[in-house]
Amino acid sequence: MTDVELRVEALSLSDVSAIPPEYVRLEEERTDLGDALEVARAASDDADAARIPVVDISAFDGDGRRACVEAVRAAAEEWGVMHIAGHGLPGDVLDRLRAAGEAFFALPIAEKEAYANDPAAGRLQGYGSKLAANASGKREWEDYLFHLVHPDHLADHSLWPANPPEYVPVSRDFGGRVRTLASKLLAILSLGLGLPEETLERRLRRHDQHGVDDDLLLQLKINYYPRCPRPDLAVGVEAHTDVSALSFILHNGVPGLQAHHAGTWVTARSEQGTIVVHVGDALEILTNGRYTSVLHRSLVSRDAVRVSWVVFCEPPPESVLLQPLPELLANGAGKPLFAPRTFKQHVQRKLFKKLKDQQDNNAAAASNGIIPK
């Protein structure tokens, strides 16, 4: 089977009425799946449905500074996700970014294959259909484009599409702007802990004896979720937490993102002029669990294509030791909940756990006479 035939987009375009078994989620996962459009419509019609918090951070630069810090702190602690208004990302830049990403995915699959990655060889960046193994052994209903977007001098620009021509300049512009936004949010989140505003960013970057520090890394992943004939059986991205410190998300207006809160899945609504921000594992570790790395997933739709742009803000892979901030453990305030690890070690440990869970699931299935798909 060729790479083109392996792409989820190719399956969608083939007008199949069923989906291959490797995309059918386990029975226990399917109880609350459904068409993203229908699920979002039901949530919108339910006046009592929980809503992800909306926080305007433009107030941080004015008289509303204290209230802004408190609102962000509460959202990070109670939800681990929030809609951010007043983020300072110009609407025209976001429109150009969306247009460029959608134009890339509108290209023939064979043309996109020029940027194909090779996870088996350790090359995760590029165009692909799966980033990592999962516990169930099932595949996700998405294709994607994944590459470093900041700092620019570390990026492999051979993975940045030459077509459309707008892709490179707008992605570079967007990456720099999100980097500035990340610093602002980390400052607000530091103050929410009762610590100096530079604390979290400083601990996410390396400082050696010469005062030199590594920059934060921003990875851009464009998720492309084609139409799916059985959205009640498949997911775009399965339930997971991000390994990053923060994740910034915008989309093409089609719903699908869900966050797990208080024992239920809450659908992210379309909040005009906002972007979604997730707290990731790295920040949860630094704050010793005060800020929550949100469990989330993405549904798919029978009638609509969903595209989302996610920027993962990450510490350098090996030069920073992630561990709970000592300031939060002082004077017997608490015990560390996380062992010290580099970011690379954390990612590897999480991947190993996924593989181990999959092996255990396969072994259990085999013992019951079931052949894992």
UniProtKB/Swiss-Prot annotation:
<dbReference type="GO" id="GO:0009718">
    <property type="term" value="P:anthocyanin-containing compound biosynthetic process"/>
</dbReference>
<keyword id="KW-0847">Vitamin C</keyword>
<feature type="binding site">
    <location>
        <position position="306"/>
    </location>
    <ligand>
        <name>2-oxoglutarate</name>
    </ligand>
</feature>
<comment type="similarity">
    <text>Belongs to the iron/ascorbate-dependent oxidoreductase family.</text>
</comment>
<feature type="domain" description="Fe2OG dioxygenase">
    <location>
        <begin position="216"/>
        <end position="315"/>
    </location>
</feature>
<keyword id="KW-0223">Dioxygenase</keyword>
<protein>
    <recommendedName>
        <fullName>Leucoanthocyanidin dioxygenase 2</fullName>
        <ecNumber>1.14.20.4</ecNumber>
    </recommendedName>
</protein>
<feature type="binding site">
    <location>
        <position position="296"/>
    </location>
    <ligand>
        <name>Fe cation</name>
    </ligand>
</feature>
<dbReference type="InterPro" id="IPR044861">
    <property type="entry name" value="IPNS-like_FE2OG_OXY"/>
</dbReference>
<dbReference type="InterPro" id="IPR027443">
    <property type="entry name" value="IPNS-like_sf"/>
</dbReference>
<keyword id="KW-0408">Iron</keyword>
<dbReference type="InterPro" id="IPR026992">
    <property type="entry name" value="DIOX_N"/>
</dbReference>
<dbReference type="GO" id="GO:0046872">
    <property type="term" value="F:metal ion binding"/>
</dbReference>
<dbReference type="Pfam" id="PF03171">
    <property type="entry name" value="2OG-FeII_Oxy"/>
</dbReference>
<dbReference type="GO" id="GO:0050589">
    <property type="term" value="F:leucocyanidin oxygenase activity"/>
</dbReference>
<dbReference type="InterPro" id="IPR050231">
    <property type="entry name" value="Iron_ascorbate_oxido_reductase"/>
</dbReference>
<feature type="binding site">
    <location>
        <position position="242"/>
    </location>
    <ligand>
        <name>Fe cation</name>
    </ligand>
</feature>
<keyword id="KW-0560">Oxidoreductase</keyword>
<keyword id="KW-0479">Metal-binding</keyword>
<feature type="binding site">
    <location>
        <position position="240"/>
    </location>
    <ligand>
        <name>Fe cation</name>
    </ligand>
</feature>
<comment type="pathway">
    <text>Pigment biosynthesis; anthocyanin biosynthesis.</text>
</comment>
<keyword id="KW-0284">Flavonoid biosynthesis</keyword>
<dbReference type="GO" id="GO:0016706">
    <property type="term" value="F:2-oxoglutarate-dependent dioxygenase activity"/>
</dbReference>
<dbReference type="InterPro" id="IPR005123">
    <property type="entry name" value="Oxoglu/Fe-dep_dioxygenase_dom"/>
</dbReference>
<comment type="function">
    <text>Involved in anthocyanin and protoanthocyanidin biosynthesis by catalyzing the oxidation of leucoanthocyanidins into anthocyanidins.</text>
</comment>
<dbReference type="GO" id="GO:0031418">
    <property type="term" value="F:L-ascorbic acid binding"/>
</dbReference>
<dbReference type="Pfam" id="PF14226">
    <property type="entry name" value="DIOX_N"/>
</dbReference>
